[in-house]
Amino acid sequence: GYYPVNKKTVENNENWGNNAETIVSNGPYKLLSWQHNGELNFVKNENYWDADEVVTKTMNWPISESQSTRLTLVEGGEADMMVEPPVADQQRLEEAGLLHIGPMLGNYYYLFNVKAEPFTNPDVRKAFSMVINRKEIVKNIVKGGKEEAYAFVPYGMLESNGTDDFREAGSYLVYEDVEQAKELIKEAGYDENHPLPPITILYNTSEMHKAIAEAIQATWHKAFGADVRLQNQETKVFLANREAGKYQVARASWVADYGDPQNFLEVFSAEDNDSQYHSE
């Protein structure tokens, strides 16, 4: 997406967006203070074009990577709302009328580093994708009204004709077939005598990310006998390593900045694609 920024602010300080003292924005709120890894504090922006419609004058956002900690803050009266409560608590919260599920233009996926073995081979990447049971992961781990994804662009955005859903018009691009996946691995030269190299899944700290990684770890080991290891990192370190390509498999997600398929597809032509791939 594109948002206007103050030219002088950007030119005078390349890190202008990293601290409350230097950040400049034009939304309904101003960032009053920012305690990194602690809390964000906002006040109403009286210069906002629609300020009369902004009812809440202040907002405080506690920061925590832990879903359980965020839920404790809400249930303890220290916060009013949160996103993504722990899966184990979702049914209880829904029955109590506290969990509200709404549509979101987003996806959750795993990146294969196309420059790291064994994922330099597209057939290996395809095979590893083909054995993942997305429906079971959504049903037993993710929950919360999510849907399994069989293509990169989610439902909810229009085709170029302005009437059809882009995802429905494009059909599925991914399918599950364990036996075919095993054949692809054999064709790639891997078997009992030439096993796959150890594989590490990189993810940032979260109960849900961990549970998904464990499920996929078990799936890949069962299907291919792969030695799959898990590595979690604090978000800042995780993002830096993922961007630098210091991983084999890494979790990722994307929420649309605007409602057009281009917002998802443009990543494939970007030279800074985190999977180290870009289309000419």
Q: Predicted segment positions?
A:
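Ligand-binding "clamshell"
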Residues: 90-101, 246, 260-275
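Structural transition elements
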Residues: 148-187, 206-211
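Ligand/substrate-recognition segments at binding pockets and active sites
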Residues: 36, 178, 182-256
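Ligand-site clamp/hinge motif
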Residues: 17-20, 46-92
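Gly/Pro-rich hinge or "lid" segments in bacterial periplasmic/extracellular proteins
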Residues: 1-53, 58, 183
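Periplasmic-binding protein-like
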Residues: 98-113, 272-280
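A bilobed periplasmic-binding-protein/Venus flytrap-type ligand-binding module shared by bacterial periplasmic
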Residues: 43-47, 104-127, 131, 140
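Extracytoplasmic/peripheral linker and loop segments enriched in polar/acidic and small residues
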Residues: 138-139, 172-175, 226-243, 263-280
